[in-house]
Swiss-Prot record:
InterPro entries linked: Ald_DH/histidinol_DH (IPR016161), Ald_DH_C (IPR016163), Ald_DH_CS_CYS (IPR016160), Ald_DH_CS_GLU (IPR029510), Ald_DH_N (IPR016162), Aldehyde_DH_dom (IPR015590), Aldehyde_DH_Superfamily (IPR050740), Succ_semiAld_DH (IPR010102)
Site, as annotated: Transition state stabilizer: 193
Stated name of the protein: Succinate-semialdehyde dehydrogenase, mitochondrial
Species, as recorded: Mus musculus
Localization of this protein: Mitochondrion
GO CC, alphabetical: mitochondrion; synapse
Catalytic residue list: 294 (proton acceptor), 328 (nucleophile)
Catalytic reaction equation(s): succinate semialdehyde + NAD(+) + H2O = succinate + NADH + 2 H(+)
Length: 523
């Protein structure tokens, strides 16, 4: 059953909600809120349609629609912020920074912890929002909310672990002091595939460091960012510290340019495509801003002859089909050694047929939701057709799902070659292409033959091989006999054109801190 968001106004007494699909008249001058009438219902306070700037819910001159990717139904409309709204949000964040940076680390820690507590208290509603606007299965959405909240918990603790240094210099009457100070206003630009976790992973670190933020969420999934704003406000995060400016696809370019060029912004943190990242880097270069970027991936998944096949198949399922293959670290290229190839392909196909169920994310038992939009479906379809035309074999799947719309069958291809689009381009969909290889050196060469290097996976029971391959793979993160590698305690990021900097872990907060050296003389 599809969930439907309806924008409406609330009277002080809050009358009973109308039936799904119907609107009540809106009293003039009241703030816009949203509600959803879906499985279990949703708490109305979490569903907002306005921007959140300077601690206030503000409309924009225009709105844009948000759609349920599973049904195509309109969920509601959200403020379509443009250049004036973006500049106002930056100014609000800048004004708030002057006081927020002076708040004690203990108080910042307590506020982040309170925000975490509120996320946990509202985890079910937050998960339903994710499923409604992104399409991912509710169970996965629930997992994302817990993962998302953990970043707030983690950085609430890291706020109290921002340490400096005292250095004894070569001069007897001098000492060097090293201080860490917040960089300033951070512009946070996030993707649709993890609409909550990608915000808290960045914002948690920024606020813990003493920075203020302006968040521009993806146009497909703005409700999650606005729900987080509501909870941040309830937690007591001061006005202007956390700002959200949703905008449509048509205005994304101009808003992004403002965030990258405004002199009041000191830091850019972006998760998205490599192509968009390059554009933002170009804009940020003119004012030499601090930049963190988590960009595209083309993750190799290597299975060596020594691997435990069942374990490798389980890892492949976890790595490839989470969020229907729409994750930046999901396996894009499967490289399987000749001696184990046929067994792996057979068991992988069996696991896919047995375990994967395509459907609406709210339906019990669904493991594969829709792709985010028609363009995403067309990309997967194009890659499958290209591979088949060049000689690949469809083992299972291979076409749009019978449900129609944005659904695509989980697909396994064999007899794949390196010249196929599914090997050279990131898929971001439920497509698993398998290449057969003979030698370790060959697999490593294929894996490293990419301009990007975010994550990589391999399965082996040979200790010497494990050390060699882990060191040789040109990626920022490696999964050894493991298909799920993300953890709040560990650094997340890539090499080559997969990005700059690291998020999460003890290293994540450093992305929002400047190191200042003070020479103390005359001692």
């Amino acid at each position: 059953m599809a969930t439907c968001f309806l924008l409406r106004s609330f009277w002080a007494a809050r009358p009973a909600l109308p039936p799904p699909g119907r609107f009540r008249p809106e009293p003039a001058g009241t703030p816009r809120r949203s509600y959803a009438s879906g499985p279990g219902g949703l708490h109305a306070d979490l569903l907002r349609g306005d921007s959140f700037v300077g601690g206030r819910w503000l409309p924009a001159p225009a709105t844009f629609p948000v759609y349920d990717p599973a049904s195509g139904a309109k969920l509601g409309t959200v403020a379509d912020c443009g250049v004036p709204e973006a500049r106002a949000a930056v100014r609000a964040a800048y004004d708030a920074f002057n006081s927020w940076k002076g708040v004690s680390v203990k108080e910042r820690s307590l506020l982040l912890r309170k925000w975490y507590d509120l996320m946990i208290q509202n985890k079910d509603d937050l998960a339903k929002i994710i499923t409604a606007e992104s399409g991912k299965p509710l169970k996965e959405a629930q997992g994302e909310i817990l993962y998302s909240a953990l970043f707030l918990e983690w950085f609430s603790e890291e706020a109290r672990r921002i340490y400096g240094d005292i250095i004894y210099t070569s001069a007897k009457d001098k000492r060097g002091l090293v201080l860490k100070q917040p960089v300033g206003v951070a512009a946070i630009i996030t993707p649709w595939n993890f609409p909550s976790a990608m915000i808290t992973r960045k914002v948690g670190a920024a606020l813990a460091a003493g920075c203020t933020v302006v968040v521009k969420p993806a146009e497909d999934t703005p409700y999650s960012a606005l729900a987080l704003a509501q909870l941040a406000n309830q937690a007591g995060i001061p006005a202007g510290v956390y700002n959200v400016i949703p905008c449509s696809r048509n205005k994304a370019k101009e808003v992004g340019e403002v965030l990258c060029t405004d002199p009041l912004v000191s830091k850019i943190s972006f998760t998205g495509s490599t192509a968009t990242g390059k554009i933002l880097l170009h804009h940020a270069a003119n004012s030499v801003k601090r930049v963190s970027m988590e960009l595209g991936g083309l993750a190799p998944f290597i299975v060596f002859d020594s691997a435990n096949v069942d374990q490798a198949v389980a890892g492949a399922m976890a790595s490839k089909f989470r969020n229907a293959g729409q994750t930046c670290v999901c396996s894009n290229r499967f490289l399987v050694q000749r001696g184990i190839h046929d067994s792996f392909v057979t068991k992988f196909a069996e696991a896919m047929k047995k375990s994967l169920r395509v459907g609406n994310g709210f339906e019990e038992g669904t493991t594969q939701g829709p792709l985010i939009n028609e363009k995403a479906v067309e990309k997967v379809e194009k890659q499958v057709n290209d591979a088949v035309a060049k000689g690949a074999t469809v083992v299972t799947g291979g076409k749009r799902h019978q449900s129609g719309g944005n659904f695509f069958e989980p697909t396994l291809l064999s007899n794949v070659t390196r010249d196929m689009l599914c090997i050279t381009e990131e898929t971001f969909g439920p497509l698993a292409p398998v290449i057969k290889f003979d030698k370790e050196e060959e697999a490593v060469a294929i894996a490293n033959a990419a301009e990007v290097g975010l994550a990589g996976y391999f399965y082996s029971q040979d200790p010497a091989q494990i050390w060699r391959v882990a060191e040789q793979l040109e990626v920022g993160m490696v999964g050894v006999n493991e298909g799920l590698i993300s953890s709040v305690e560990c650094p997340f990021g890539g090499v080559k054109q997969s990005g700059l900097g690291r998020e999460g872990s003890k290293y994540g907060i450093d992305e929002y801190l400047e190191v200042k050296y003070v020479c103390y003389g005359g001692l």
